[in-house]
Amino acid sequence: GNIQVSEKKYLQILKEILTYNPAYIDVEFFTHGPSFAALKDFRDKMVLSYHNFDEVPTDLTNRLIKMHEEGTAFVKVAVMPERECDVLDLLQITRDMTLEYGDHFISMAMGDLGRLSRISGYLTGSCWTFASLENSSAPGQISLKETEYILDILEK
């Protein structure tokens, strides 16, 4: 998500990861387009992602459609809400995309406001959630223990 490296270094890192034959590899689409283009043969293992640590952009639906059209295994978006309605908008956009294009979308709103989005996949169709083992790797991330507890209650 939030890493500042040259395009050459980014591609080098991704190629190194692929030598370990991971189930999936996360590739930033809008900030590292050339790396995505160089790895198109690995679409079936690719989580095509978009991170925005500042806002929920008004063109998010269009971005998701563009990413979906690339034909990767999953499309992931992580955005920073400024208001409660930003979280609700993300939940609705995720649901709309899932109903229209299938169940390969992953979405989350970051920060304290976004915590609901991390556990509401059963409502929106977001097919993954992310939890921390010890230290949070993203703003608003919930621990694995808390995530399991909450999801267990919600799935009863």
Describe these PLM feature segments.
Residues T19-A23, A38-L48, H68-F74, T98-G102, ...:
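Glycine-enriched alpha-helix->loop->beta-strand junction motifs that scaffold or abut catalytic
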Residues L14, L18-G33, V47-V56, A73-E84:
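Catalytic beta/alpha-barrel core
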